[in-house]
């Protein structure tokens, strides 16, 4: 017995509904990003299947980007809880085991939108973390205007984290909706007919 064509929709349905809950839900916590990361990780298991003109490879890139950005969005929470070192080790092991290098795809002559987005977002994440680390090691008397800035805006780095992560989450949500439409129309689950009068 062959599986229903609608079974292909299940991971994308889970991504779109859980991402919508995270983005538009009332009083969601930073840890709520783990809910959409579960089906995104499920989508990553299809990396070896290169059918569909590279569509599955692009899905893998979107899922890895979302997982890395989801981990980065939890950085302020984990740093506050004293889990910064565990976060680094887990992130490096995760990307190393996957063989993911965000800037490698740019060497290709046909770099995709998600490859450029991933490279830019990963560069932004690194810059933000370097800025936060450099501010943490500066002595208080080193820069008067810098210490005044952080006294006035103590949550500057968590806000910058949100400003970097939220557009990526919105794009992942829109991508999952686009995949819904593509799979639905391609599998015949939804047939668009034109009535003839």
Task: List each language-model region with its residue ranges.
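Juxtamembrane/transmembrane-helix boundary motifs in multi-pass membrane proteins
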Residues: 5-9, 50, 54-58
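Transmembrane helical bundles and short interhelical boundary loops of multi-pass, membrane-embedded
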Residues: 14, 18, 54-197
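Transmembrane alpha-helical segments
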Residues: 40-49, 94-98
């Amino acid at each position: 017995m062959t599986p229903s064509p609608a079974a292909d929709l299940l991971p994308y349905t889970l991504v779109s509904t859980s991402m919508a809950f995270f983005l538009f839900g009332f009083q969601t916590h930073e840890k709520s990003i783990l809910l959409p990361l579960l089906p995104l990780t499920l989508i990553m298991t299809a990396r070896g299947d290169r059918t569909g003109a590279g569509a599955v490879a692009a899905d893998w890139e979107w899922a890895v980007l979302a997982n890395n950005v989801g981990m980065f969005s939890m950085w302020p929470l984990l740093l506050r809880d004293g889990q910064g070192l565990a976060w680094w080790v887990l992130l490096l092991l995760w990307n190393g085991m996957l063989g993911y290098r965000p800037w490698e795809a740019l060497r290709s002559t046909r770099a995709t939108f998600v490859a450029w987005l991933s490279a830019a977002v990963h560069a932004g994440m690194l810059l933000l973390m370097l800025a936060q680390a450099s501010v943490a090691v500066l002595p208080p008397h080193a820069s008067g205007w810098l210490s005044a800035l952080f006294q006035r805006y103590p949550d500057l780095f968590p806000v910058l984290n949100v400003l970097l992560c939220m557009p990526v989450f919105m794009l992942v949500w829109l991508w999952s909706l686009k995949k819904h439409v593509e799979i639905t129309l391609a599998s015949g689950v939804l047939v668009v007919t034109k009535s003839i009068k």
